[in-house]
Design a protein with these regions (language model features):
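Positively charged n-region of N-terminal signal peptides that target proteins for export
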Residues: 1-5
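Soluble, non-membrane globular domain cores that form compact, hydrophobic packing
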Residues: 6-8, 12-283
Length: 283
């Protein structure tokens, strides 16, 4: 098991000791003009994102709208990634944001600083970029973000964490994954689509405090359309388990394995769900 360490003329409230505060604006900030607008589909996303398009595609990317704004020599960018559903948008947001640092008074869930704001609303993952991090431009960035987000439908997705994860997980650690790229920063179970998610079947994971002092375990749950598909994924994982993971105890519906560092993991089949727990100190 390989765990990897893991907006310009509006008068707005500026920086506070506890973080950035803002006042929502309704229109494009005075003086700023749209200088460029481009759209990218699934077929040409690689032309914009060099080396990182795959994970967007795995989470259900559909279309990117890129808008650049200028004021003299200054520039701000807006990137709107339309995903196939709210779960996909939340998934890529959580994957990119990591531990969130939200701005106060912002209209949607977000994480950011003066360089970049990440946000998610409905089926859209949004990036608002202040490339040089200039503090005087931050009010204009907020204004552009508020304007862009106001036009996005607020579709409500399923609360998968409440549905699938037991209570008690550590705040800020919950993630969604739809394939190996979303899971890879946490654990490598094997090559390719090892859990047979096909880019459509959702998994959730989060960290929990383990029974040992200072121990942090991770629980992942993948919910399949049927028990038969869950069993097929279970069998595929058993047959193609990463060579760094040593099988210890195996039955028809469970597996205990050990990684190169001596930590344990478990895999169990429960109806149409696979449950994986790893980074366990003792079994």
């Amino acid at each position: 098991m390989r765990r990897k360490p893991l907006f310009a003329a509006l008068a707005l409230v500026g920086f506070l000791v506890c973080g950035l505060s803002l006042l929502a604006a309704e229109t494009t900030p005075e003086g700023w003009k749209e200088t460029e607008r481009r759209e990218y589909t699934r077929n040409d996303l690689y032309g914009y994102i060099d080396g990182g398009a795959e994970i967007f595609l795995e989470y259900g990317f559909q279309k990117l709208t890129l808008i650049r704004y200028g004021l003299g020599k200054e520039e701000l960018d807006v990137e709107l990634y339309r995903m196939d559903n709210p779960e996909g948008a939340l998934g890529i947001y959580l994957a990119k944001a990591g531990r969130e640092t939200p701005l106060t008074d912002f209209p949607t869930r977000n994480s950011g600083d003066r360089y970049q704001i990440m946000a998610v609303k409905g089926s859209t993952f949004a990036l608002f970029n202040n490339p040089e991090g200039k503090e005087p431009l931050f009010p204009a960035l907020i204004s552009l973000a508020t304007e862009a987000l106001s036009s996005i439908p607020d579709e409500k997705g399923r609360d998968l964490f409440a549905e699938l994860l037991p209570p008690g997980f550590l705040a800020g650690t919950a993630r969604l994954f739809r394939g190996p790229l979303g899971l890879q920063p946490i654990i490598t179970l094997g090559d390719g689509d090892i859990l047979l998610q096909k880019g459509t079947i959702l998994g959730v994971l989060a960290d929990y405090a383990g029974p040992e002092k200072g121990e942090i375990q991770t629980l992942a749950v993948v919910s399949y359309p049927s028990a038969q598909e869950a069993k097929k994924a279970f069998d595929n994982l058993i047959a193609n388990l990463d060579s760094y993971l040593k099988k210890e105890i195996q039955s028809e519906d469970s597996l205990t394995f050990k990684d190169f560092s001596g930590k344990f993991g478990t895999l169990s089949l429960s109806g149409s769900r696979l449950l994986l727990r790893f980074n366990i100190s003792k079994i």
